[in-house]
């Protein structure tokens, strides 16, 4: 194997929705309806996984678990997870379009990848209706990945590798090592690693910083540098082979991975 064949991007915080704001907005509103204040940090803790799994993880947080007991009179169980998940979905759909702006440089990097003969895939923790809505919004802005897979399609989400492997099968790639997974969360990194692919973290546009483009640009240079370094360290600790600030900076990383593949290296 001498070269890369495909790149798989995440959605919120990587290619759309600078700061990954939509899922935080919907999740905090969901728990507020039950009198539970969910902090942004708690909402972001397990970002990137399938939203039903995400709700389950939030309920298991000690503070949230205590609050749930106090307000409901008992412990939560899978019936409550399903109830919350069903209530979450329309909440997420309501805010999705408002946070669907394609992150700067995404369309251009996709064009460059296609120019190199690479396929472009995408995975997400969103449901199929949510993903379809994002696909429509992104296409109107010029971003059209060649494949888009969600947990509904595979029976499970991150950190399991199934979505990435389904795309690899659809693209008929020669080996998982010929694919690069790019995302802004720890679960993105683990998804790529578990699939046997190269994992590239995105530090400043996504969940680890959690800021809109306008808020990010309003920071002083030293503030941006500090937040970027902190996000980079977290993604590196999750196992990322590389970390970039935004997807528009992916080209040099791909060149290095191509060289490593040609030298016989694997992820």
Label the predicted regions.
Residues 1-5, 107-115, 127-267:
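Asp-based, Mg2+/Mn2+-dependent phosphohydrolase catalytic module
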Residues 2-116, 132:
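N-terminal helical cap/lid subdomain that shapes the substrate entry/recognition surface
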Residues 40, 122, 243-245:
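A structural preference for short, hydrophobic beta-strand core positions in alpha/beta folds
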Residues 99, 123, 156:
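Glycine- and other small-residue-rich loops at beta-strand/loop junctions that grip anionic moieties
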